[in-house]
């Protein structure tokens, strides 16, 4: 038995069958029930021509079905593909096609979008619709109802042997603004991103230890606040399923701090996983409300992945949760979990500071690891258990996954310094990526959407500081002669091209866009305009 995620979670289910695994609204399922339903779904998929190596899209809100679909894919050596439910039709088509989806499990609400996209994806041959609180007609997408499909499957675990080399793909934003699929081997993902399935102990040396740990360790109840379509929440869920914990999912489509704190009290949540200030600030403010009477006594850890806390928000939360430990983790889709923040950040530190192991380094211009304490800025890199590359993108793979001086490194573009004590200070992305509430937004895609408006001659998009979201999207626009452009008009137009969180919240009109001699936008100039000019502004991400 290798370190395969399906094998490991099945072994945990056998070790603690009657233990609750997932809570979602009024639905509570044990490990045995979760495994049985995933097994039934896996057999249904096999019976309908979906099997080893096929890609299964999960176009779902947070739900038990999301986890069932993930586990079912693992069982048959297929690959679950996360789909951002905020995508509009053009973005969905790109992802469906780029990911070579053979099947899609979607919420009923999304049937019209699936109907619009599916005919343009030649290899897509199975659609399953999960019931929700809408009355959308699933016949428009020719989808099969999910529950009868699951019920029809066998409960036998008579699947083909699996491998630690089975594939897991996580789609994330690309440098051109389009999503790209990060390919991980199961075994590498387990140790690089999922803490070996033992978040508060040593990683396992044998596969059997995962179930042993799950049975013997204390049960930890975890609440991943972010959507499961994001790696931060998906990995949190897998970590605690592997460790025999209990996962609490929020049963709403929108971020609701009041509901989250009520769930914390009702389910005695121990660990909360969030995405930086975008979630941390509203959660802190909810606790600070006059008359707030939430029971947070069970919480002993609050973690942030995908975006770090600011010191101010961390202090707000600490004041309300004095007995909790606050953990920023750094890494990402390409790097996994590379380290955790130091307890106290020095006041003069130019960025958040983290502890890391020997697999993480800061590389100089010659791609050699910098020694501690030089004060030099370099590229954050990781070696060892890292992804295979990007799916169907050898060019970007070659740029991000590099061979240098006998080592293979993943270099995602973060700039950093290695301090005298060996800790890592993160300085930010070397690219122009905008991080709004943990969502990666790439200017080129939004610029293309803006330029497709009849009144826009040219446009540059940058991120500007935002107290809640970390950054918000600002557009610097040159209108066509005789034309005018308003924020409201561009907002409505962009929403037909890109997801809502990518739409500019500020508009700065200029006589002419400044570009470099190469023709590339001058982002430094654009940031100065966006930071110094009066803005027509809207809300956050």
Language-model segments: which ranges?
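AMP-binding/adenylate-forming catalytic core of the ANL superfamily
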Residues: 87, 93-96, 104-106, 262-265, ...
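Conserved pre-ATP/AMP-binding loop-to-beta segment of ANL
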Residues: 17, 152-171, 177-178, 212-221
């Amino acid at each position: 038995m290798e370190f395969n995620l399906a094998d490991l979670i099945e072994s945990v289910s056998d070790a603690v069958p009657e233990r609750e695994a997932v809570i979602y609204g009024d639905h509570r399922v044990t490990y045995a029930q979760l495994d049985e339903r995933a097994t039934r779904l896996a057999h249904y998929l096999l019976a309908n021509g979906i099997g080893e190596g096929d890609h299964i899209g999960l176009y779902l809100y947070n739900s038990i079905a999301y986890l069932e679909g993930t586990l079912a894919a693992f069982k048959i050596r297929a690959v679950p593909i996360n789909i951002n439910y905020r995508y509009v039709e053009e973005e969905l088509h790109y992802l469906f096609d780029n990911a070579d989806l053979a099947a899609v499990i979607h919420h009923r609400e999304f049937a019209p979008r699936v109907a619009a996209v599916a005919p343009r994806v030649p290899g897509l041959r199975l659609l399953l619709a999960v019931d929700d609180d809408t009355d959308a007609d699933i016949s428009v997408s020719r989808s099969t109802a999910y529950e009868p499909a699951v019920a029809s499957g066998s409960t036998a675990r008579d699947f083909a042997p699996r491998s630690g080399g089975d594939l897991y793909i996580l789609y994330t934003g690309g440098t051109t603004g389009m999503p790209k699929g990060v390919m991980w081997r199961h075994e590498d993902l387990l140790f690089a991103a999922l803490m070996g399935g033992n978040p508060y102990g040593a990683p396992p040396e044998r596969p059997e230890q995962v179930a042993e740990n799950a049975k013997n360790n204390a049960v930890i109840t975890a609440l991943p606040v972010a959507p499961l379509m994001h790696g931060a929440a998906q990995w949190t869920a897998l970590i605690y399923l592997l460790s025999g914990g209990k996962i609490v999912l929020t049963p709403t489509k929108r971020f609701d701090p009041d509901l989250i704190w009520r769930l914390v009290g009702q389910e005695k949540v121990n660990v909360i996983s969030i995405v930086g200030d975008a979630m941390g600030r509203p959660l802190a403010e909810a606790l600070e409300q006059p008359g707030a009477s939430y029971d947070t006594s069970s919480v002993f850890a609050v973690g942030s992945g995908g975006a770090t806390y600011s010191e101010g928000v961390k202090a707000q939360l600490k004041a309300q949760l004095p007995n909790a430990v606050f953990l920023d983790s750094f890494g990402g889709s390409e790097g996994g979990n590379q380290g955790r923040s130091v307890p106290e950040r020095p006041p003069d530190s130019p960025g958040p500071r983290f502890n890391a192991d020997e697999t993480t380094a800061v590389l100089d211009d010659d791609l050699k690891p910098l020694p501690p304490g030089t004060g030099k800025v370099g590229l954050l890199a990781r070696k060892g258990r890292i992804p295979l590359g990007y799916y169907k993108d050898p060019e970007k793979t070659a740029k991000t996954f590099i061979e240098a001086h006998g080592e293979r490194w993943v270099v995602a573009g973060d700039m950093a310094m290695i301090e005298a004590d060996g800790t890592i200070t993160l300085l930010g992305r070397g690219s122009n990526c905008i991080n709004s509430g943990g969502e990666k937004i790439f200017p080129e895609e939004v610029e293309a959407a803006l330029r497709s408006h009849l009144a826009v001659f040219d446009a540059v998009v940058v991120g500007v500081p935002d107290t809640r979201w970390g950054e918000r999207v600002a557009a610097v626009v040159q209108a066509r002669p005789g034309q005018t452009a308003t924020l409201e008009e561009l907002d409505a137009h962009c929403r037909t091209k890109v997801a809502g969180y990518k739409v500019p919240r500020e508009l700065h009109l200029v006589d002419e866009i400044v570009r470099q001699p190469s023709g590339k936008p001058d982002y430094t100039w654009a940031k100065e305009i966006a930071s110094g000019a009066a803005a027509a502004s809207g809300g956050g991400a």
